[in-house]
Design a protein with these regions (language model features):
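Class I SAM-dependent methyltransferase SAM/SAH-binding core
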Residues: 4-67, 72, 87
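Conserved beta-strand elements of beta-rich interaction domains across eukaryotes
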Residues: 17-20, 40-43, 59-61, 75, ...
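A generic structural signal for alpha->beta connector loops
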Residues: 32, 51, 99, 157-159
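Short SAM/SAH-binding signature in class I
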Residues: 69-77, 103
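Conserved catalytic/acceptor-binding region of the Class I
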Residues: 80, 101-198
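Short N-terminal helix/helix-N-cap motif within the alpha/beta-hydrolase-1
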Residues: 82-84
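A short glycine-rich, Lys/Arg-flanked "PGG" loop and its adjoining helix->strand segment in the class I
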Residues: 86-101
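C-terminal transmembrane module of eukaryotic multi-pass membrane proteins
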Residues: 193-212
Length: 212
């Protein structure tokens, strides 16, 4: 939200809902809307508003909703999780009403430095290399951030807009907004790293937990 100046979305159900925070916030922000969040795992019960529901479902399978059903589909953070992205986008297209929107937010797995000093042997560079290799081996790409705009167009969507943002890792930036983003992004890395790499490294790449 800091990146988008407090907006939950850049356009007026959530796929891959995780803990359900985004879906809950959207339901709070738009009390007349009906928000549905789906994920493979159940969302812990809490103080969700009355207009949001969470369902256990696989977005990679055929969607169980009627055609032309949704006004908006939001997809986030599914890099490395989807084997057939074109199918997922076709399902979204089929279940959106004419004139409706799809929005997807993904993180690039390619870590970069602003001055080009990130060497191939740096831990963050090796993380990128290993993620790409694991995605190739499983058929579930980690590079969807670089390819999603083209694939969404191929699914039939029109007026596709791609926006790219710089997210620092840590509060090192002198820009107040980037400093705040970096602080949250560092927390995201610290809390998310185990979930990102544990299965990929041990089950796919066959390396130990103390690989580095």
């Amino acid at each position: 939200m800091t990146q988008c100046s407090g907006m939950l979305t850049t356009e007026p159900p959530k796929k891959g809902t995780g803990a359900g925070i985004w879906a809950t916030d959207m339901a709070d922000r738009f009390p007349t809307a009906q928000v549905i969040g789906t994920d493979l795992s159940p969302v812990p019960p809490g103080m969700q508003p009355h207009n949001v529901t969470f369902e256990i479902d696989d977005c990679c399978s055929e969607w169980v909703f009627p055609n032309d059903h949704f006004d908006f589909v939001h997809v986030r953070g599914l890099f490395g999780s989807v084997a057939d992205w074109p199918k997922l986008y076709r399902e979204a297209y089929r279940h959106l009403r004419p004139g409706a929107y799809i929005e997807q937010v993904e993180w690039s797995v390619h870590n970069r430095s602003g001055n080009g000093t990130l060497s191939p042997n740096h831990t963050l560079a090796k993380f990128s290399q290993n993620a790409i290799r694991a995605g190739t081996m499983t058929g579930k790409t980690f590079e969807i951030a670089e390819n999603m705009a083209g694939l969404i167009r191929e699914a039939g969507f029109e007026d596709v807009v791609e926006k790219r943002f710089k997210w620092p890792v840590g509060p090192w930036s002198t820009d107040p907004k980037l400093k705040e983003i970096g602080r949250w992004n560092l927390l995201n890395w610290e809390e998310g790293m185990e979930g990102w790499v544990m299965a990929a490294y041990t089950r796919v790449l066959g390396v130990g937990l103390y690989f580095y």
